[in-house]
Design a protein with these regions (language model features):
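Substrate-binding/access-modulating region of protease and related hydrolase catalytic domains
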Residues: 1-78, 102-105, 122-132, 136, ...
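Solvent-exposed, polar/charged alpha-helical surfaces in well-ordered, non-transmembrane soluble domains
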Residues: 9-12, 45-49, 81, 142, ...
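Glycine-rich, acidic and aromatic/proline-enriched surface loops and short helix-turn segments
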Residues: 16-19, 112-116, 166
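C-terminal subdomain of the subtilisin-like protease fold in secreted/lumenal serine endopeptidases
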Residues: 23-27, 150-191
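Acidic, glycine-rich active-site loops and adjacent beta-strand->loop/helix elements
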Residues: 31-33, 61-65, 86-89, 116, ...
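A generic alpha-helix surface/boundary motif
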Residues: 33, 142-143, 183
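Extracellular S/T/G-rich loop segment that most often corresponds to the catalytic His/Ser-adjacent loop
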Residues: 75-150, 154
């Protein structure tokens, strides 16, 4: 529920302010199917610029599943870490985005729980509501990356991505659904 221009403006702000605020991890819990190929390319270029600047970029796979090729942009970027929802992969609630991308990249990279998550909900009486989707899964992986960087601040974004891959728990599903598997925080932090 936003405009591509707003996302690109946010990416520029992050690049301009990452040193001042010590930004190391970027969570992107949005995605679009992009009606025009150019919009898709612009969003991909924006997140890849963040990645190339050394930031750990984690984006949602989107909720367009269960069909193949349903990962949304910017999660369809080859470089960044794309997250699906481990509890929205099968059955009637199989909405988690699946690869491959338009560029034949196997996505998502991994999955994390994202069903019935208590989260901030503007307009709710107490400010909270129960939400579901890959936008709820993505912050779990971004938070795991932040914990690892707190423990090992010298790690690069590529090293974080590889540690997530090495520590993910195989769910026995096709790679275009689960990627490397489900986030295993304990195993990840032990690497």
């Amino acid at each position: 529920n936003g405009r591509k221009e707003d996302g690109l403006k946010a990416f520029r702000w992050i690049l301009e302010n990452k040193r001042y605020y010590g930004i190391r991890v970027v969570n992107i819990s949005v995605g679009t199917t992009c009606r025009r190929a150019e919009d898709h390319r612009v969003l991909i270029a924006g997140v890849e610029q963040l990645w190339d600047a050394g930031l750990v970029v984690v984006a949602a796979a989107g909720n367009q599943g269960p069909k193949a090729g349903s990962v949304t942009a910017p999660g369809s970027s080859r470089k960044i870490i794309t997250v699906g929802s481990s509890d929205l992969l099968t059955g009637r609630t199989a909405i988690s985005g699946r690869g491959p991308t338009f560029e034949c990249v196997c996505k998502p990279d991994l999955v994390a729980p994202g069903n019935h998550v208590l989260a901030c909900a503007p307009g709710a009486d107490n400010g909270y509501g129960v939400k579901s989707g890959t936008s709820m899964s993505t912050p779990l992986v971004a938070g795991a990356a932040a914990l690892m960087l707190e423990k090992n601040p010298e790690l690069t974004n590529v090293q974080i991505k590889m540690k997530l891959k090495e520590s993910a728990r195989d769910m026995g599903l096709p790679k275009n659904q689960q990627g490397w598997g489900e986030l295993d925080l304990e195993r990840f932090m032990e690497l």
